[in-house]
UniProtKB/Swiss-Prot annotation:
Organism of derivation: Burkholderia lata (strain ATCC 17760 / DSM 23089 / LMG 22485 / NCIMB 9086 / R18194 / 383)
Gene encoding the protein: nbaC
Top-rank EC class of the record's enzyme: oxidoreductase
Gene3D superfamilies in UniProt: Jelly Rolls
CDD domains: cupin_HAO
Name this polypeptide is given: 3-hydroxyanthranilate 3,4-dioxygenase
Residues given in the record as Fe cation 1 binding sites: H51, E57, H95
HAMAP family: 3_HAO (MF_00825)
Family to which the UniProt record says this protein belongs: Belongs to the 3-HAO family.
Amino acid sequence: MLKYGTPFNFSRWIDEHAHLLKPPVGNQQVWQDSDFIVTVVGGPNHRTDYHDDPFEEFFYQLRGNAYLHLWIDGKRERVDLKEGDMFLLPPHVRHSPQRPEAGSACLVIERQRPAGVVDGFEWYCDACGHLVHRVEVQLKSIVDDLPPLFDAFYASDTLRRCAHCGHMHPGKAT
């Protein structure tokens, strides 16, 4: 028997996991314990953080539309992902996926992180653009590792206040 099973109908898999591809879960990993983190992420989903991935990330917008806010050279840029689009994001490009459409689905493929290689999560000031907070983590599980980091940032006025201009980051997207 093959470790990851035999081929399966991916559209049917998405339909069967649709209840996990919307808030509050929003994503589902296709295979466990592989060399790749293969995830389907659904909408609606709005994020206020920017991910600093040490490796490339592959996006394939299967259903609906989404976009990525990118933080490049001190300013925010936008990359649209229309249904059917694929995109390869280079390593260390800060990005914040935005999935405003209910029922949307995006295949995201990332490399597993070797020991000692960390991911960064950053929040920027809406008023002046300076970095408000950065946290690094040895990412083992997207589902288990990220919520405590995000909750700590959202719960702390100290972490959310911009040291440069004093503006308060609004916290969690609504």
